[in-house]
């Protein structure tokens, strides 16, 4: 039996939240992301006035492929699930609460081509 090789690709992105005192939703569009989603990792900083974040991967038409539910702040989170990626997706990150300074949430999407 021949060995199989999988081309695992990592797509790194950042969602930057402005200083704000309301719920903030940041959408980042990722293009040329064709293949099977394998897992997603993201890291949240110590956020002020909130205790959770949420990340979603959506199709351009608004359908949700992936929804993390709420995830604690100040953590690196990994969640795996397999679904097809159609080429262009929106990564939607939601944070609630007051931020006195801009904050970055970084994410890595891993998929096979």
What are these model-derived regions, one by one?
Residues 1-4, 88, 112-113:
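Interface-prone segments of viral and bacterial extracellular assemblies
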Residues 1-31:
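Solvent-exposed, flexible loop/coil segments flanking beta-strands in beta-rich domains
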Residues 12, 60-69:
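Local beta-strand/beta-hairpin segments that build beta-sheet-rich folds
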Residues 26-35, 80-85, 112:
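Extracellular and analogous surface-interaction loops
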Residues 34-42, 83-104:
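Noncatalytic modules at the cell exterior or secretory-pathway interfaces
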Residues 102-113:
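Exposed low-complexity, polar/acidic, P/S/T/G-rich flexible segments that act as propeptides
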């Amino acid at each position: 039996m021949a060995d199989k090789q999988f081309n695992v690709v990592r797509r790194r992105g950042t969602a930057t939240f402005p200083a704000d005192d309301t719920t903030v939703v940041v959408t980042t569009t990722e293009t040329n992301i064709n293949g099977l989603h394998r897992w997603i990792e993201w890291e949240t900083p110590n956020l002020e006035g909130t205790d959770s974040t949420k990340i979603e991967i959506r199709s351009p038409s608004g359908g949700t492929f992936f929804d993390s539910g709420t995830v604690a702040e100040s953590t690196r989170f990994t969640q795996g699930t397999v679904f097809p990626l159609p080429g262009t997706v929106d990564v939607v990150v939601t944070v609630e609460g007051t931020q006195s300074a801009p904050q970055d949430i970084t994410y890595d999407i891993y998929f096979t081509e």
